[in-house]
Regions:
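Alpha-helix N-cap/helix-start motif at coil-to-helix transitions, marked by capping-box chemistry
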Residues: 32, 56-59, 63, 118, ...
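N-terminal "arm"/small-domain region of PLP-dependent enzymes with the aminotransferase-like
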Residues: 1-60, 64-67
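Short, solvent-exposed loop/turn segments at secondary-structure junctions
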Residues: 22-26, 93, 117, 164-166, ...
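Conserved core segment of the aminotransferase class I/II
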Residues: 213-264
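Conserved core of the PLP fold type I
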Residues: 43, 48-189, 193, 199-218
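Short, intrinsically disordered, charge-balanced linker/junction segments flanking boundaries
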Residues: 1-4, 151, 260-264
Length: 264
């Protein structure tokens, strides 16, 4: 089972205030706005919201996400993305699970930060890969150590990182380390899973360019979520991938839950 399961079960106890589960404060949930939107959806297209939909997700939402990412990241160097390269997933945890199913066989290798996110390790572990930790300091993975491991490790399928407010350390990768990582990924043509659940939670300082804005070969699989900025109970997140990867992920997504609930 998931190592996060017991942590989340504890949070249901009324006398527990948990700092372990990554739960947003309920006071921040936009309940009134969500109620208004739910009424509007029911009035305008209630039947459509309750019907089966495409496995990649509702096109209107994908277009909105693409427009927002283009507005934020094209000025930082990202190649403009299209809605057709976005898949809506049932929480970013499903994106992790689908990525593991697409990329990993037993004894394949995932390069991870040291330490790394427990939920990602749990999702990938279902495919029985090997996890190789890359020495990491307060600025991110150490490039020399990463290249050394790339050169000496067989069957590396992808690199998994959380550049913004990393879980569990909380570090934010420096711009230079992000560039170095993408230079190495490009040089050795290794896919990179950029997990960005916390990027919108910056309280001070300038936003640092994401890895997807430094990706000339479209190797980055970008994961974003509404769990920290809207409400985790909606189980609403997305992934941005190149055409080939997204086609494979679409097959897996359709075979597991058909599609993320249209009503959300």
């Amino acid at each position: 089972g998931s190592d996060l399961g017991p942590l989340l079960a504890l949070t249901a106890q009324p006398d527990i205030i948990s700092f372990a589960g990554g739960l947003p404060a309920p006071i921040t949930f936009p309940l009134k706005e969500l109620e208004e939107v739910a009424v509007k959806v029911r009035q305008e297209d209630g039947a459509g919201a309750m019907q089966y939909g495409p496995s990649l997700g509702f096109m209107g939402l994908r277009e909105t996400i693409a427009a927002r990412m283009n507005r934020m990241y094209v000025p930082m160097g990202m190649t403009e993305i299209s809605a057709k390269n976005i898949m809506i997933v049932t929480g970013s945890q499903q994106g992790l699970d689908i990525t593991g199913r697409v990329f990993l066989d037993k004894d394949d290798v995932v390069l991870i930060e040291s330490p790394s996110y427990l939920g990602a390790i749990g999702a990938f572990a279902l495919e029985q890969p090997k996890f190789v930790e890359v020495p990491t300091d307060g600025e991110g993975m150490i490039p020399e150590e990463l290249e050394k491991l790339i050169q000496t490790t067989e069957r590396v399928k992808f690199i998994y990182v959380i550049p913004n407010y990393q879980n569990p350390t909380g570090i934010c990768w420096s711009l230079e380390r992000r560039r170095k990582l993408m230079e190495l990924a490009t040089k050795y043509e290794i896919p990179v899973f950029e997990d960005n659940p916390y990027g919108d939670l910056r309280f001070e300082g300038e936003e640092i360019a994401p890895l997807i804005s430094m990706d000339p070969k479209h190797l980055v699989m970008y994961s974003g979520t509404f769990s920290k900025t809207l409400a985790p109970g909606m189980r609403l997140a997305w992934m941005v991938c190149n055409d080939d990867i997204l086609a494979k992920m679409d097959l897996v997504k359709g075979s597991t839950d058909l599609h993320t609930p249209s009503v959300t």
